[in-house]
């Protein structure tokens, strides 16, 4: 993938860029793998906004991506097409299995049309193949990692993401995550070889607010510029800093939202670096 930059012929195009989609081989998705996708506008079942900054955006259809490839062990599949998916940053690959089935998977870097991929404990160590971590050599870069055996891929699924298998001790494999965290995962869990493709996606400059609206992202308005009726930080004469610790619109403290006593925290060997520890 490469990034195409626009000439500054208008204010919205100044500095903006777009993916060149050179790796895409087909523009129409596989119809049997499509499902309707209904927008919520950030509202819950009572109609109240539970997630701000959501709404609008282009109409989409959901592509059924196979994050659980256990049922196709030992069945080779040919990469028929690399396709665009509006619901994620990564590209997706359409596989035609030898038994006639068709499935989508996340397209790893360097996977191209015509390649043959396979799942199962005896699969080769090459991009796109899916194996249990007990069968993957230490030091291998992987993605689409399960957290529970048979639970489907949960980690390292966005564009350019990857995890490194750094050690294996007993029934656990140690993984180095993109955040720097080192975590134990059951060796029976599966992962796909290679890193997710479309890594240059993070370098795209969207250029104008309108392109974000196409994606369904609404403006983010700071609380300190609102009125007191709208936000606890609102009001004051002139520009003010809010005068209190950051809170949301309901007055609940912002930041540090992760649970400190999550059951799976015992599997963390080394925590990710945060704040001043990032240096």
From Swiss-Prot:
Q: Which GO terms describe its cellular component?
A: large ribosomal subunit
Region: Disordered; residue ranges are: 34-58, 225-279
Q: Name one GO biological process term.
A: cytoplasmic translation
What's the short name of a Pfam family annotated to this entry? Ribosomal_L2_C
Instruction: Tell me which UniProt keywords the record has, alphabetically.
Output: Ribonucleoprotein, Ribosomal protein, RNA-binding, rRNA-binding
Q: Where is the composition biased (Basic residues)?
A: 269-279
Q: Where is the composition biased (Basic and acidic residues)?
A: 251-268
Q: Function of this protein?
A: One of the primary rRNA binding proteins. Required for association of the 30S and 50S subunits to form the 70S ribosome, for tRNA binding and peptide bond formation. It has been suggested to have peptidyltransferase activity; this is somewhat controversial. Makes several contacts with the 16S rRNA in the 70S ribosome.
What's the name of the protein? Large ribosomal subunit protein uL2
Q: Which organism is it from?
A: Micrococcus luteus (strain ATCC 4698 / DSM 20030 / JCM 1464 / CCM 169 / CCUG 5858 / IAM 1056 / NBRC 3333 / NCIMB 9278 / NCTC 2665 / VKM Ac-2230) (Micrococcus lysodeikticus)
Give the organism's phylogenetic lineage: Bacteria, Bacillati, Actinomycetota, Actinomycetes, Micrococcales
Quote the gene name from the UniProt entry: rplB
């Amino acid at each position: 993938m490469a990034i195409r930059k626009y000439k500054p012929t208008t204010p919205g195009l100044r500095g903006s860029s777009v993916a060149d989609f050179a790796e895409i081989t087909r523009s129409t998705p596989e119809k049997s793998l499509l499902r309707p996708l209904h927008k919520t506008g950030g509202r819950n079942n009572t109609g109240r906004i539970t997630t701000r900054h959501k709404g609008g955006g282009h109409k989409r259809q959901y592509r059924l991506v196979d994050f659980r490839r256990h049922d196709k062990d030992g069945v080779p599949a040919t990469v028929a097409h690399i396709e665009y998916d509006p619901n994620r940053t990564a590209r997706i690959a359409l596989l035609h299995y030898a038994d006639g089935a068709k499935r989508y998977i996340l397209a790893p870097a360097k996977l191209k049309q015509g390649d043959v991929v396979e799942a199962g404990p005896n699969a080769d160590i090459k991009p796109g193949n899916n194996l249990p971590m007990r069968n993957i050599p230490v030091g291998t870069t992987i993605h689409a990692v399960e957290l529970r055996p048979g639970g489907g891929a949960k980690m390292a699924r966005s564009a350019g993401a990857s995890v490194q298998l750094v050690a294996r001790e007993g029934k656990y494999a140690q993984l180095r995550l993109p955040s720097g965290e080192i975590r134990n995962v059951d060796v029976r869990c599966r992962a796909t070889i290679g890193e997710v493709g479309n890594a240059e996606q993070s370098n795209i400059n969207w250029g104008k607010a309108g392109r974000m609206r196409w994606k369904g992202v609404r403006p983010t308005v700071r609380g300190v510029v609102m009125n007191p009726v709208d936000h606890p930080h609102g009001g004051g004469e002139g520009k003010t800093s809010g005068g209190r610790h950051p809170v949301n619109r309901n007055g609940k403290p912002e930041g540090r939202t992760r649970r400190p006593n999550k059951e799976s925290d015992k599997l963390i060997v080394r925590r990710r670096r945060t704040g001043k520890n990032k240096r």
